[in-house]
Amino acid sequence: MKNKLPPFIEIYRALIATPSISATEEALDQSNADLITLLADWFKDLGFNVEVQPVPGTRNKFNMLASYGQGAGGLLLAGHTDTVPFDDGRWTRDPFTLTEHDGKLYGLGTADMKGFFAFILDALRDVDVTKLKKPLYILATADEETSMAGARYFAETTALRPDCAIIGEPTSLQPVRAHKGHISNAIRIQGQSGHSSDPARGINAIELMHDAIGHILQLRDNLKERYHYEAFTVPYPTLNLGHIHGGDASNRICACCELHMDIRPQPGMTLNELNGLLNDALAPVSERWPGRLTVDELHPPIPGYECPPNHQLVEVVEKLLGAKTEVVNYCTEAPFIQTLCPTLVLGPGSINQAHQPDEYLETRFIKPTRELIIQVIHHFCWH
């Protein structure tokens, strides 16, 4: 029953007070089970059918799908339940206590993005779900801030095919229809150590890596020349050499050298295509030094994403907001949800607040976000 729901600000407060940090470091990583239970209970109170899905390969993480109505199509509203870790020394407030000051709601996850679920629940007070002609789905995922394992697993296993989806990441209520992807790799070269007084008795991994870097930089130039997407501020795929380490002493031939790099592909480029381009670039080194060069993923890759600009979802949201869709450089779960249906990224709060100390969401977003959620539900589930 709707009258069982706490007030909007109390829902928000409870979400922020329930830690759900995602981290690759096990000591910092937390289960999102308590947060999922909170959400599940609230959506059940509204009459939704709720499924909780354990996410394999995680440390006790879960997805939640709340649904009302049956049949084909409908609308999916999605978001992630986890936050990044916080630096206690840089926060001036308790990250897990929602505080309001000077038109801002402070707390870890206020903008990115646990607060989005408070907006959905509050908006549903004014929606008569019994009159929906198409189903409404609410998806809460796990581990977006690390591996995106929740969205990946949901997209791989669900049979749902809504008409469209909106992911409520903080975009300042500016609709986003495309973003670049991200792949990160470790290039490792195994040489052969020896005393520097006799270089011929060893194989210097740093020298081999120098050769490999030359080929990687040529790939960077080729990506810039070959691929263009003018809507992006940087209208081509970028390649960055981010970290390198090799050797342990000035008088030893370096036995091992490792380079960490990333590529940010534009929409339309497949991960297989990128892996092929990287392997082709490094082929001369691999062929000259068989078995000494390896390429490994540092993190699960994220493809680029694009919603067709002429899709009904884009047209409807642009009309409702009076704003054109944008493209951005950061990554979201959209590439995985997009495999199910056309998807937009659109939510309250600023991306500039994501992962920042004293994270906040401006209260000016409360009314328009609530109204927007009601409008999109009416349009895609009542018509």
UniProtKB/Swiss-Prot annotation:
**Keywords associated with the record:** Amino-acid biosynthesis, Arginine biosynthesis, Cobalt, Cytoplasm, Hydrolase, Metal-binding, Zinc
Query: Where is Zn(2+) 1 annotated to bind?
Result: H80, D112, E169
Swiss-Prot/TrEMBL GO biological process terms: L-arginine biosynthetic process
Please list the GO terms describing molecular function.
acetylornithine deacetylase activity; zinc ion binding
What's a GO cellular component annotated to this UniProt protein? Answer: cytoplasm
Q: Which Pfam families does the record match to this protein? A: M20_dimer, Peptidase_M20
Q: Extract the InterPro entries matched here.
A: AcOrn-deacetyl (IPR010169), ArgE/DapE_CS (IPR001261), Bact_exopeptidase_dim_dom (IPR036264), Peptidase_M20 (IPR002933), Peptidase_M20_dimer (IPR011650), Peptidase_M20A (IPR050072)
Q: Which cofactor does it need?
A: Zn(2+); Co(2+); glutathione
The pathway this protein participates in, as annotated, is: Amino-acid biosynthesis; L-arginine biosynthesis; L-ornithine from N(2)-acetyl-L-ornithine (linear): step 1/1
**Lineage: superkingdom:** Bacteria
Q: What class of enzyme is it?
A: hydrolase
Which of this chain's residues are annotated to bind Zn(2+) 2? D112, E145, H355
Question: What detail does the entry give on cofactor binding?
Answer: Binds 2 Zn(2+) or Co(2+) ions per subunit.
**Cytoplasm among keywords:** yes
Q: Give the reaction(s) catalysed.
A: N(2)-acetyl-L-ornithine + H2O = L-ornithine + acetate
Query: Which residues does the Swiss-Prot or TrEMBL record annotate as the active site?
Result: D82, E144
- The enzyme's E.C. designation: 3.5.1.16
Gene3D superfamilies registered for this protein in UniProt: 3.30.70.360, Zn peptidases
* Location of this chain's protein in the cell: Cytoplasm
- Family per record: Belongs to the peptidase M20A family. ArgE subfamily.
Function, as annotated, reads: Catalyzes the hydrolysis of the amide bond of N(2)-acetylated L-amino acids. Cleaves the acetyl group from N-acetyl-L-ornithine to form L-ornithine, an intermediate in L-arginine biosynthesis pathway, and a branchpoint in the synthesis of polyamines.
PANTHER family per the record?
Answer: ACETYLORNITHINE DEACETYLASE
Q: How does it assemble?
A: Homodimer.
The molecule here is called Acetylornithine deacetylase
Organism of derivation: Shigella flexneri
